[in-house]
Amino acid sequence: MATPIWKDYTVDLGTTDGQAFTIYDKADNTGNVIYTGKAYIRPGETHAFVKVNDICADYLAQKLSLSLVFTGISYEVFPGAQTFSCYKGTTFVTSWTFYLNYEYKDGGTDKIKLRPNNPITGRIMRGMPFCITRLYPSASAAAHLRLYALPDSSSSTYPISVQGSVNLWSKANNDSPNYEITVAEYKDTTNSIDYNLALQLIDKCHRYALYYVNSMGGLDFLVIEGNWRMKDSYDRKTYKQTYDNGNLANRGTVDYHNDIARTWELHTGWLTDAQAGRMGDLLGSPLVFLCDCDDNYQLHPVIITNGDCPYKCHRKDGMIEYGINVELARNITRR
């Protein structure tokens, strides 16, 4: 059974103090070495233990990373879970399987299927790209996905039978007369629906949307339906030279290097209790992209600078809106 990466998984390396060990990215030592080290016996204990989930976390995040390329309707298969093994020299100790999950809940850890997609509002503008991610920790599971509301208004079937995970990419078509996009997952080919995700199509009337990897490893989005403000801050580097009346190039003070920090203040629309309860998934995400829908849906890597995520506490609070502060993650420099 696969284990969520947040959950501690400890390997017993025996009674030798300073026991050398190696971790591989396969169920045996034919895989790549991702870590080598030594484990020591702690005071009061008789065995040397090592906690391996912290060791595997960074590797797993890269291995199961999402490819942010919107190229029409396509799908991409990548491992839904990763098996690791531990060896003492050439002696096998144990193996285990992790999947990328930071929900910190035990409820879904023993299920074959998980639900990595849960957009906060479920609203998507016409023309926006979207991704449906399905994670299967069990190697015996298979997916049958169907995508509705295509340009010709008919349903289309993608008979994807995989062992692992599926990313289904598409765009909300601008000319579609439908008001909803439905992605249905079937248990088998007998049309027995096991999972259904409905996205509400709205007109393209907002400039920005945020895409983010949620706590279950899926890629979700939130249309920014409130006000927004963009600001550039400048860190200027200057030096002084002799001013020459006859040569304008010798102008005195010279601005030779400007570092530009671009930030946005974004405001959501009004959110219900259930929607506001999922804002922590966005504000706590380490991987966030700002989509500029007025610039061919360009994705810009950003970091969220909010220091907290307040939740609604009283019924009288009514609906709630959030201010989200983001900063462009890449450097902008002018020389």
Language-model region placement:
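Preference for solvent-exposed, low-hydrophobicity sequence contexts
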Residues: 1-201
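Extracellular/virion structural assembly segments
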Residues: 2-5, 10-18, 192-335
